[in-house]
Amino acid sequence: MKLLVMLWVLAVLPCAADEAAIRAAVSKSLPLIERSSKIAIEERSNCFTCHHTGLPVMTFVTARERGFQIDAVNLQTQLDFTVQFLAKGRENYLQGKGQGGHAFTAGSALWTLKLGGRTADATTEAVTAYLIGHQKELHHWKPPSIRPPSEESPFSATFFALESLRSIPAATQRLADARRWLEQTPAQTTEDRVFRLWALHAAQSDSTTAARDLLQTQRDDGGWAQLENMASDAYATGTALVALFRTGSVKADDAAFQRGLSWLMQNQHADGSWHVVSRAKPFQKYFESGYPHGKDQFISITAACWATTALLLALPVVP
């Protein structure tokens, strides 16, 4: 009987993802993200976006830390573009108006610069002051529009704002208010659970229960789904894995993390991409960014950035 139990346990435990296979998956994905991020700046030179600027920067920085050769010129171009975008709106930030996307754009742009190692200046100080005052009565931040899955949750907007304000002395009360809101407000979707976990960690609050809630929604196939009635996809799986790892809720060799990695590698397309079907209603003019999957390319590159970053986190940092 004991032997049967041991065999059953061995059967259901995932094999550790092979480092060579992970590197191969990343090596196929990175060129697609790099190419598309370059094209997007040329096509939409007046607009910072998470899907073609912020998240690619996250991926490039993480890849560089793991010993991958990245296009350093493109990385600096993305960071310079973010600086210039915020600088164009500096007066609006000083007046409390912000830019399109409001707190979500402001917070994610500052997060992007932080990832890229850029230091504070007069423009970023204006943006942080805007975030401190914006939506203060809510005790959290929320996006101005509902564009699922990546721009619909108040938890994601709150996370990006907290990451930008956590070291700002003038934001102490705002951070305390947000911490209480996070502790008292339940998550409804995977996007909520992912960013509630990350935001609680950023707010230096206990995130143990939030991590458990996210882990409990992992599917039998190893992935996560955006909603209960949807199948597992690369966006939900990638965001969940990155948040769990970055908050210290799991280690790279934990079974849940390994199962998620396996799902990502099994569902990567032969060309190195991942395909996620868009749920957001288009409101901007369509343009071809060079990433596969046509009208689904914006959410697909978003998913690819999270998925690639999750795979990278399983690899050792190269000194």
Segment roles from a protein language model:
Residues 2-12:
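Bacterial N-terminal signal peptides
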Residues 14-319:
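Preference for long, amphipathic alpha-helical scaffolds in soluble/luminal domains
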